[in-house]
Amino acid sequence: MNMTNLFTLAAAVPSKSVQATGWFLETAWLIPALPALSFFLILFFGKKMKYKGAEFGITAIALSLILAICCVGQWMNQVDNASDNYKKSSSYETEEKYSETSSQDLEENALTETIEVASAEQMNIYAAGDESGYEPVAVDAVIERFTWWETGGKKFQVGIMVDGLAVMMLFVVTVISLLVHIYSTDYVSGDRRYTHYFAFLSLFSASMLFFVLSENILQTIVGWELVGVCSFALIGHWWEEKPNSDAALKAFLTNRVGDMGLLVGMIILFWSAGSWSIVDINVAAINNEIGQTTLLIASLCLTAAVLSKAGQCILHTWLPDAMAGPTPVSALIHAATMVVAGIYMVARLYGVFFEGYDIAGSSFNVLALVGSVTLVGAGLLAFVQDDIKKVLAYSTVSQLGYMVMALGVGAWTAAVFHLFTHAFFKAGLFLGAGSVSHSVHSFDMKKSMGGMRKFMPTTYKTFIICTIALMGLPPLAGFWSKDEILVGTGGWGLFGGTGGNGSYVFALVMGIIGAALTCAYMTRVIYLTFFGEFRGDTHGHGDPHESGKRITVPLIILSVMAIGAGFLNLPVGFLTGNTTNWQERFGHYVEPVATYFPAIAHGTPSWTLAIFSTIVALTGVGLAAHYFFIKVNAQSPAATELANGLTAKNKLAKAGHTVLKQKYYLDHLYTDIIANGTKGPVADAAYWTNQKGIDGIVNQVGKQAANSATFVYEKIDQNLVDGAVNLSGKASEGLGETTRTIVQRGKVHQYAAIMFAATTILAGLFIVFV
């Protein structure tokens, strides 16, 4: 860090903080509550309604969107007015203090003492405040909670945490969810479980919104699992077909692997920090109240959860198979719910990851490595997919790799900004693919598509816009967020840049390669889907036709957002004049300026890097366009690849193509080797244990019990018990017979003598004893 940057960082420390307030922020719990309520209304009354419950879901999520927008406005107002609440106590006091400090003291003291609480956003606030006469002020998150129960001195609380990150996600989730709801009314019209679909769509949205607002890690776990359960239900919506139910089960089980890491990591954080609160845990991590080794172990465990939920390499295999669900569900999963939950969790607990992986001043960590490898590996897999939804699925895996990589290099704002922009253009692409499939009744680009631009002009135009945004080409949204990630790697001194949290050269190189791959495989998608000749079957319905308004209007809205979203965080220096209201606005409102957020450094923008990455991306477009639009089209407008291409000529290329087609053999590894390889021996061992062990013991116990019963019956019951009873009976019988023989002889005088004797004896006994 040079002296100028160090001075700016030191001067940026906010000396005061204000508590954000406002009715909408404090009652943000209504936002997830509304779709949760609609879930129950649809279940109980949906089938009786005119639109089979869809009206409940759409109304609820629309109201949630209105509340989310109000929260966004209220939060922006709080941040903008924060510095106006406090006048500077003395003019330029902080600046004079540091101007009098020697360069050596500045290097030794300012770096170690102020970096713990400063951030790049704080620099911006100070810079603005320096001119206006106000000092930088931190805006604390709105936290509303109540004690659920208390035991052993530990309080279990439930509440909400609302800050810039939360309100941004509330807006994204509600916007995408509302458009998906509207789109679905046409797409799944006439479905055999139409009401069931909308019920779980509402619950899915509510679960993600609950997760976003979680104030503590217990709520985070609950929201995390609810999102997983809803995705399982919706991926397997058409469960009668075995591939669909298998895909749902695969998604569920794969995520269980990562969830074990989530539980272990959260337990470690609770016992280390002594609190469930996300704020308390982050503060403890940042202030070194938790040991480095403990933070590292917790970070590794939580990273395992990110691998499964966000579809990162080696646990990404479930995500392409999840395309078995309805296309609107795929859009919601990939743009605003399931997979971005992993990114959000890292962003929310960033103090833990930043300190645990020692991101500042480093050049390597697990997050950066996983993200870098995933974005390139998934990009290569997208090349060989014929199913348009699977191409987009691997594209999502790749783009999530960008976000994970950005978080790994300390580019927090860049990662979250890319999550924001990606939500709009990826939702647009999935819904666009659904529009095409709705017309041709297939997702196979090679067999069922081609030339679709002539039949579906609106879908084509919106798909092109969202594709350019995904490619990261200027001036659309993806360009600004992707290049901010590349800047954040800090490994680009070659391009004249400064700053960053370390020198992550490998991440930078992989990020640039990933940009070229994205452009190349999306060019292939554009050609196979919209150019050439139509290769599909009309199924007796005539030529394909454009979708209805309930499908195309959401596409238009998303394409507009794919254009404009990037301008919310323009880099400083991009425009001249009074443009501070447009420069880095996203980071200004979203990046926390509080004690629960670590001190991260932002790299300065480099137009050299931006131009270079754009040239590389355009090279990817050019190579793919030359192959498909010129070579393949020249062979035949109906062709989808060259008959005598590289894979037919070159053994190495063919082998590489086979590896990609087999998805790096990961499914083979998991299913055939690990699962089946374990299942056979384990099943045999379990059978032997059951037959020889458990059954043997049970059978032996049974035999011993039978022998014991026989002994008791023969020796005790028959001889002893029955013998005693029989003997007493025979004795009574003998006595009676003897008495009868002796006494009862028919002589009256003998009876009288006996009666007299008996009376005499009784009288004597009476006299003696009474």
Regions found by a protein language model. Give the residues of each.
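Membrane-entry segments of alpha-helical transmembrane domains in multi-pass membrane proteins
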Residues: 19-34, 49-57, 154-172, 210-223, ...
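Hydrophobic transmembrane alpha-helices and their helix-loop junctions in integral membrane proteins
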Residues: 179-223, 229-550, 561-567
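Hydrophobic alpha-helical membrane-embedded segments
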Residues: 426, 516-525, 615-641, 645
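Hydrophobic alpha-helical membrane-insertion segments
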Residues: 60-78, 258-267, 463-475, 554-577, ...
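Aromatic-capped, Gly/Pro-kinked transmembrane alpha-helices
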Residues: 114, 121-164, 571-612, 630-770
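Alpha-helical transmembrane segments
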Residues: 37-43, 179-182, 379-381, 521, ...
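Transmembrane helix-loop-helix hairpins at membrane boundaries of multipass inner-membrane proteins
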Residues: 2-27, 45-199, 274-290, 348-350, ...
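N-terminal signal-anchor/start-transfer transmembrane helix
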Residues: 32-46, 178, 307, 311
